[in-house]
Structures are given as structure tokens and as C-alpha cells.
């Protein structure tokens, strides 16, 4: 992917709400929202009609909305679908940030469109958008447990300290690129993120 048809207007960080899941691999999308708010200010506020917490991010001449669904991961579409429909957001203007077990900790990859790859949060968003798959994704590597039977407990657990540092570094680098994504400069963001070892 080198270009996006338009700048990002909504960044959705996927995860599970509640203290029980805080800091788990599955909540990598939440980690990005926390980092953006730490850097640029603002606060997430509950919007019950969208089953989500929302904030507005101001970054240079650009702004977008940040969304943290308050459904569980498997029902993320209950937040994204109604919001996108109400504001008539083209799928290409939505960036969904999620954990990716097929990438090692410390890697981030951007992608536009595609399937869900077994990720239940993406699966539900695709369903809620009327089988539309054209939204953008930021895939934050969290590593793989080695066998598919171990995936659920793995993503719902907290990473070891060295893995956590690698994931946090990747989140920080993704946060560095957000202004380019808001401007639609996907080529520049991809060049930086995809060159990470």
C-alpha cells in the first residue's frame, strides 16, 4: 500500500474493556490511543449510543476522532458500524489498530483492505460495515504462542517485560506516524514503519 484515497478521520483502537484486560496483548490498540492522548492531550469520554469512548485528536493542521470500543473485542462492530454510518465515513478513512499474532513483538505493518485473518474484532467490524473490507489497519505485532490452541490465553495475557518493551516501542513509532496518516501520506508512514526489523 502506497497511497490512501483519503486522510484518516477515525482511529479505532481495539481491545477489551476493564482492569482484567489492561496491559494484555489483545489490547495493543488501546495502547496506541493512550500514547496519542499522552502526547497530544485530550480525554476519552463515553458515548453510549456508539458503545465507545471517544476523543478528538488535534495534530498540527489535522484532526480526527479516536474511538475505544467499550464492547468486548468480538463485538467491536457495534461501536464502529453505527458511528461510521451516522457520519457517513468512507471505509478508507477509518484506521483500525489491533494486535497481530503473525508479526513478532516490535513490528508494525499498515494495510488497506483485506480479510479478518481470524481476528474476531476485525471480523465483527467487517460484518457491521455491511461486509465492507476496505478500511485501513495498523497491525501491531505481539508474537505467536507457537500453536493455534494457545492463541486465546496468549493474547489475553500480559507480555513478558522484554516483549512489552518491544510492543511499546512499536506503538510509539506508530504514534510518530499518525500525523502523516491524517494527511493521507501513507507512503511516508509505510516507509518508516515497514523498515523496522
UniProtKB/Swiss-Prot annotation:
Pfam families per UniProt: Pept_tRNA_hydro
Coarse class of the protein's main subcellular location: cytoplasm
Gene3D superfamilies associated with the record: Peptidyl-tRNA hydrolase
CDD domains membership: PTH (cd00462)
Compartment(s) where it occurs, according to its Swiss-Prot or TrEMBL record: Cytoplasm
Catalysed conversion reaction: an N-acyl-L-alpha-aminoacyl-tRNA + H2O = an N-acyl-L-amino acid + a tRNA + H(+)
Homology family: Belongs to the PTH family.
Name used for this protein in its record: Peptidyl-tRNA hydrolase
Organism: Alkalilimnicola ehrlichii (strain ATCC BAA-1101 / DSM 17681 / MLHE-1)
